[in-house]
Amino acid sequence: LALLLVALAVAYAVPDPRGVIINLEAGEICMNSAQCKSECCHRESSLSLARCAAKASENSECSAWTLYGVYYKCPCERGLTCQVDKTLVGSIMNTNFGICFDAARSEE
């Protein structure tokens, strides 16, 4: 019995690599992209809860970087560029949307 209690105490003492506030998995509720493993805190509409989501892949809709850290369209995966016409109003309203493309491939 004592050995079982010690084993349980050790198991609970080991820190969980997934955090409550940071290092969140896809689908978990977030307030800022810095909290997500994927670095994208995404919301469907202004009334919905934001959740961690995967970054946009090639030829997918994307958002340019935003100060708010919450996106209606996730930024592109590493190595891709979000081709978007940035506007001041779009930056304020978080509506600067574009398409992810591979800049290295387009130069060839």
Curated annotation (Swiss-Prot):
SMART domains documented for this protein: COLIPASE
Gene3D superfamilies, A to Z: Lipase, subunit A
Residues annotated as binding taurodeoxycholate: 65
Tissue expression pattern: Expressed by the pancreas.
Disulfide bonds: 30-41, 36-52, 40-74, 62-82, 76-100
SUPFAM superfamilies in alphabetical order: Colipase-like
InterPro entries in alphabetical order: CLPS_chr, Colipase, Colipase_C, Colipase_CS, Colipase_N
Signal sequence region: 1-13
PROSITE patterns tied to this protein: COLIPASE_1, COLIPASE_2
Keyword Amino-acid biosynthesis: no
Single Gene Ontology BP annotation: lipid catabolic process
Subcellular location: Secreted
GO molecular function term, any single one: lipase binding
Key words of the record: Digestion, Disulfide bond, Lipid degradation, Lipid metabolism, Secreted, Signal
Propeptide feature ranges: 14-18
Primary location class: secreted
Entry GO terms, CC: extracellular region
Subunit annotation: Forms a 1:1 stoichiometric complex with pancreatic lipase.
Role of this protein: Colipase is a cofactor of pancreatic lipase. It allows the lipase to anchor itself to the lipid-water interface. Without colipase the enzyme is washed off by bile salts, which have an inhibitory effect on the lipase. Enterostatin has a biological activity as a satiety signal.
Family indicated by similarity: Belongs to the colipase family.
Name this protein carries in UniProt: Colipase B
Organism: Equus caballus
